[in-house]
């Protein structure tokens, strides 16, 4: 792998020779494969997906696999039993459990596509919490909506808006997850296109865009509320420097979370702040920077869920919110796919037929399948391994 010269010079300098050598070695190795179990749909303690069962230590439901199975051909993936997610990004699970408290809260995941951090955070949030999962780019928002629908949890709303739209809507949240767009240095191992697109000019553009995004959304975080700021890049301009800029210019204090030495998380490379860096060759995952800030001010009140929904319905583009209304064709009522995916569906409404692997794959290919003659007539809910 040939890295851009400017990137190599800067990164070697900020990491130091020993860390940089380990980092380069990590980039030459195959990226680990990891998944996260959906605890709302399956028994997380007993389900087995793929080969190997090494736990991701900073995520309650995260697992490393010994290889990369053909996920596309696993009906359990399509039913939302698990989510294929890079292990470092699962650190949000640990952060939520450590800092978000034990009472139901309202959270905004600002730059959420494709949905890994949203669904991971929701698995860790106190029951009764609500999460708005937002993505401003329409095609990415549709992928996000598909993954949130598949996850099946209630109290998750998908929107297609820019941070300024939330600001205009005057919505206030207890916590905001800001996994901001970045120069993508943490994706070098997985995507050679990220190397080709990298430049010092792009780093500068990303740094400025990140500040704009956080500034636009800051009024939507209640006084005393928590912001999780993260990127998938390594340079300090987008990471430590921006985090310190948020604290100084917008008004916030840093929060430290406990970690274990064996997790091999690297602290801040510059400045005096608690930060959590996942570096290939050091920690088992891709590149990630994360830090946690608490907004200045006496602990304020976030909007109640009912008011958040009212504001969203009036001022935002909601593209998914629980079970969609059925389609009516003449005298026939056709349920929406979201009803089949939801854990809140009325299980007595439609009879259930559990199908085998061959039938499930045929269904996923949009092929007609034939059920047993004893199967109920009319609309039935198809499951695979009872999911």
What are these language model-derived features?
Residues 219-346:
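Substrate-binding/catalytic lobe of Class I Rossmann-like enzymes that use SAM or dcSAM, i.e.
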Residues 1-46, 284-289, 296-387:
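Polybasic, low-complexity RNA-engagement segments
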Residues 107, 128-134:
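Short beta-strand element of Class I
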Residues 136-171, 178:
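S-adenosyl-L-methionine
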Residues 114-127:
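Conserved SAM-binding loop of SAM-dependent methyltransferases across substrates and taxa
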Residues 139, 174-215, 228, 232-240:
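Mobile active-site "lid"/loop adjacent to the S-adenosyl-L-methionine
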Residues 33-94:
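Conserved AdoMet
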Residues 103-113:
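Conserved class I S-adenosyl-L-methionine
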């Amino acid at each position: 792998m040939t890295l851009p010269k400017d990137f190599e010079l800067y990164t070697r300098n900020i990491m130091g020779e020993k860390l940089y050598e380990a980092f380069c070695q990590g980039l030459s190795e195959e990226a680990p494969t990891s998944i996260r179990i959906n605890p709302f749909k399956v028994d997380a303690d007993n389900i087995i997906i793929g080969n190997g069962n090494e736990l991701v230590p900073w995520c309650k439901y995260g697992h490393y696999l010994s290889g990369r199975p053909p996920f596309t051909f696993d009906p359990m993936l399509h039913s939302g039993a698990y989510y294929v997610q890079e292990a470092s990004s699962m650190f949000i699970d640990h952060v939520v459990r450590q800092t978000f408290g034990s009472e139901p809260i309202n959270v905004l995941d600002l730059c959420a596509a494709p949905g890994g951090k949203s669904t991971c955070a929701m698995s860790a949030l106190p029951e009764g919490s609500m999460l708005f999962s937002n993505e401003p780019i329409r095609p990415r928002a549709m992928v996000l909506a598909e993954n949130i629908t598949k996850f099946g949890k209630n109290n998750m709303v998908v929107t297609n808006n820019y941070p300024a739209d939330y600001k205009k809507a005057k919505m206030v949240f207890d916590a905001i997850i800001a996994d901001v767009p970045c120069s993508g240095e943490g994706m070098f191992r997985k995507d050679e296109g990220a190397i080709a697109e990298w430049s010092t000019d792009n780093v500068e553009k990303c740094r400025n865009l990140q500040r704009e995004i956080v500034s636009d959304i800051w009024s939507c975080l209640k006084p005393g509320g928590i912001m999780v700021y993260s990127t998938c890049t390594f340079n300090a301009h987008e990471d430590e420097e921006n985090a310190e800029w948020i604290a100084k210019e917008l008004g916030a204090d840093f929060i430290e979370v406990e970690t274990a030495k064996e997790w091999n998380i690297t602290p801040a490379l510059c400045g005096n702040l608690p930060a959590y860096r996942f570096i290939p060759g050091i920690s088992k995952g891709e590149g990630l920077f994360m830090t946690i800030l608490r907004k200045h001010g006496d602990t304020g009140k976030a909007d109640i869920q009912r008011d958040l929904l009212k504001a969203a319905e009036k001022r935002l583009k909601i593209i998914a919110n629980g079970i969609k209304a059925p389609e009516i064709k003449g005298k026939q009522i056709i349920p929406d796919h979201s009803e089949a995916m939801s854990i809140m569906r009325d299980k007595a409404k439609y009879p259930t037929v559990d199908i085998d692997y061959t039938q499930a794959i045929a269904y996923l290919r949009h092929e007609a399948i034939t059920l047993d003659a004893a199967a109920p007539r009319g609309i039935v809910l198809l499951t695979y391994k009872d999911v």
